[in-house]
């Protein structure tokens, strides 16, 4: 239950921090609502459902709220700043809006899958299957034309896809490093 709580609170943290940053800085929000639906489904909702049903051999330890917040708030901040930075950089170098939004959606979803990987480490069995299926779902959303159109995505260029993977990997590494310090 603690890992699933961390997952859902991380989403709440990045959503709140990103909304505050966009409002305070007077920036355009980096997503359409459809993008949030896709990212949230693949990196929080669907995996959260399956992960909550899996057996958890860990015993209860006092300090649930503190541990959960000490993970979720910094992880959410890292994701929010990463997504905002990605979007600002894309705009700065002249990437069209649809591509910038797709890039931000990819970074958000992949960083969310990184959070699941961190929380469920070491991955094995069903946990690996869940993360792999969600990553495959993201790829399918990009390559199936009617799904891509429904979610208002564009096929990223190879450079954009590589950038999204690299940026999400850096965000995941930052979250993993932060996690190692707060345990």
Regions found by a protein language model. Name each.
Residues 86, 91-183:
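C-terminal transmembrane module of polytopic membrane proteins
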Residues 1-123, 142-143:
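Membrane-embedded transport module
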């Amino acid at each position: 239950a603690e890992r699933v709580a961390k997952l859902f609170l991380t989403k709440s943290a990045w959503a709140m921090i990103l909304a505050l940053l966009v409002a305070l800085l007077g920036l355009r929000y980096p997503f359409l609502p459809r993008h949030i639906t896709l990212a949230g489904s693949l990196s929080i909702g669907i995996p959260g459902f399956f992960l909550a049903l899996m057996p958890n051999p860990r015993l209860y330890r006092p300090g649930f709220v503190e541990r959960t917040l000490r993970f979720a708030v910094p992880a959410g901040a890292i994701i929010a700043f990463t997504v905002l930075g990605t979007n600002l950089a894309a705009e700065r170098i002249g990437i069209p809006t649809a591509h910038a939004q797709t890039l931000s959606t990819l970074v958000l979803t992949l960083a969310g899958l990184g959070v699941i990987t961190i929380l469920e480490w070491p991955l094995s069995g069903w946990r690996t299957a869940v993360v792999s299926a969600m990553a495959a779902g993201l790829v399918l959303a990009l390559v199936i034309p009617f799904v891509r159109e429904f979610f208002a995505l564009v096929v990223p260029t190879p450079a954009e896809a590589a950038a999204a993977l690299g940026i999400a990997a850096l965000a995941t590494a930052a979250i993993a490093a932060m996690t190692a310090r707060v345990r």
